[in-house]
Regions:
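Glycosyltransferase catalytic domains, chiefly GT-A lineage
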Residues: 98, 124-126, 293, 299, ...
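A short, basic-hydrophobic beta/loop patch
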Residues: 300, 305-306, 327-387
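Intrinsically disordered, low-complexity Ser/Thr/Pro/Gly-rich regulatory segments
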Residues: 1-226
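Solvent-exposed functional surfaces
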Residues: 109, 363-487
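Well-ordered, non-membrane alpha-helical segments in soluble/globular domains
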Residues: 136-151, 179-181, 282-288, 420-421, ...
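Short, flexible/disordered intra-domain loops and linkers
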Residues: 102, 131-139, 276, 313-322, ...
Length: 487
């Protein structure tokens, strides 16, 4: 596609704004799920017949409201989410149309566009009032068709160096695991943004406050390069428990960009590593920031991370330095780290790291880090459990949630049953076709029902076998016979 003309650029800018006052007013209107207006009292019956409802009444006028259609309500919620993430350059209305091809008809209306310092986000929103199966082949194909042209147009206006992420956001649509829609989105590097993702990002906003952008970028641009400059840091290489690790000192600003916290939440099930972390405690985060800035405080204990080695292009490299010692197995050298999002999983120390996010020292201080390289998932999980069992107790809900990962391959039968119960309950809570979908609090997700009563009920029921470490005390065959008799 040829470059945009001056008139085309102006047409796009007319529907975008970075005016703080205007954005604040838009946010107030968009966060309300209802359309509202004031009408004359003698007009009220006409509006009531069209689905409006009365809110308040004055002498001659009435304040009325009407629930926004599902599609527009969802678009407004996504817009507000970006506003709460800190974006202050957004589309002003729903009439933003971009020319993406050479033909006059090659145009597309964009639902939500958010411009950040490093990236531009383009969101296609699809919503329905009631839960229904997804079928978006045409919509995804259309997005694939206009993507490159829209990307070029937005970069021409807002900066060639900006990343552009396309998001396909849905509400109340169910996707079968491994379905064609999911494959199409993945193949075209379009981020699939479901109800679970929306809930997770909003929980991040509440917990992380102004520091949320680091975790959000890690989620959106997982394993994508920040830039082509590599990070080279002096380090000591050692082995412990049969695993390679490095001791190094790194600026918090750097670790915030390449790091990622694996929260125990539905949205992170797509990540191939174990998810186990609790969300940050906002008051604790604020206290750490004040401790660093106002009291010149510091934390001499090491943050523990694990470098993800699943992609060859993002693997770290250690080069020996000259003049090393033969008196120790520890090796002195330089660690080269790819400058990419979400390649360093923070096992312990997330509050310390994020406490620096708003600090004036995030670029000048360095913090001690113990970094594992390609630590197996079960070992990473055990480190987290070992550390936290001797510090703040792991919540009963999180412990039961982790049973599946900890005990699925256990040699002990009773432990495997713990894993099975955990898996069954989580499936009930995650499957959108289940009556319990999103109603069971799993990991760090909040819901009306707790996981523990379900685990207790299953363990006492006759639906699953009973077992000691080495043998079943109630056979599966006997359970089937009992159920058959009851039927």
């Amino acid at each position: 596609m040829a470059s945009l003309t001056i008139s085309q650029i102006q047409a796009i800018k007319e529907h975008m704004t970075d005016d703080v006052s205007m954005l604040s007013k838009k946010f107030k209107a968009k966060k309300n799920p209802y359309d509202t207006q004031t009408v004359l009292l003698n007009e009220l019956d006409v509006y009531l017949s069209k689905g409006w409802e009365e809110v308040s009444k004055l002498k001659y006028k009435v304040r009325i409201q009407k629930l926004k259609p599902a599609g527009r309500r969802f678009e407004d919620d996504i817009w507000c989410m970006f506003y709460n993430l800190g974006f202050r350059h957004l589309n002003y209305d729903e009439n933003l149309v971009v020319q993406w091809g050479d033909n006059p008809e090659d145009k597309h209306q964009l639902d939500v566009v958010a411009i950040g310092e490093e990236a531009i986000f383009v969101v296609e929103c699809k919503a329905t009032e009631n839960i229904k199966p997804a079928s978006f082949k045409k919509d995804i194909d259309d997005m694939r068709l206009y993507r490159d042209g829209v990307m070029k147009a937005l970069r021409q206006i807002y900066g060639e160096d900006k990343k552009v992420k396309f998001i396909f956001a849905t509400r109340n649509y169910t996707f079968a695991e491994g379905c064609e829609d999911e494959k199409r989105l993945a193949e075209n590097k379009i981020f699939q943004f479901t109800d679970n993702t929306y809930d997770y990002v909003n929980s991040l906003i509440k917990a992380y406050k102004s520091t949320v952008i680091y975790q959000f970028y890690g989620l959106m641009f997982r394993h994508e390069r920040i830039n082509n400059d590599k990070i080279r840091i002096p380090a000591l290489k050692g082995t412990m428990g049969g695993h390679t690790y490095y001791m190094l000192s790194i600026e918090p600003a750097t670790l915030l960009k390449i790091g990622f916290v694996l929260h125990r939440t539905r949205v992170n099930t797509q990540i191939t590593m174990p998810t186990y972390q609790r969300l940050l405690v906002p008051s604790r985060l604020k206290g750490i920031g004040e401790f660093i800035d106002k009291k010149n405080g510091y934390f001499p204990n090491s943050v523990i991370i694990n470098f993800d080695d699943s992609e060859r292009k993002n693997r770290i490299q250690f080069d020996l330095a000259s003049g090393g010692s033969d008196d120790t197995r520890t090796k002195l050298g330089y660690l080269t780290i790819p400058n990419a999002y979400c390649i360093a999983y923070i096992i312990d120390g997330q509050h310390r790291v994020y406490g620096y996010a708003g600090s004036k020292y995030k670029d000048t201080n360095t913090i001690p880090v113990v970094a594992f390289d390609g630590l197996p998932s079960d070992e990473q999980l055990r480190i987290f459990m070992d550390i936290n069992e001797h510090q703040k107790a792991v919540s009963p809900s999180l412990r039961l949630d982790l049973n599946e990962d900890l005990n699925w391959e256990s040699p002990h039968l009773d432990s495997r049953l713990k894993a099975l119960r955990s898996s069954i309950i989580k499936q009930l809570g995650r499957d959108n076709s289940s009556v319990l979908a999103r109603k069971i609090a799993i990991g760090e997700d909040t819901a009306k029902l707790q996981l523990k009563p379900f685990d207790t009920a299953l363990s006492k029921s006759s639906l699953l076998p009973k077992a000691t470490k080495k043998e079943f005390t109630v056979s599966i065959i006997q359970i089937v016979l009992n159920i058959t008799k009851q039927c």
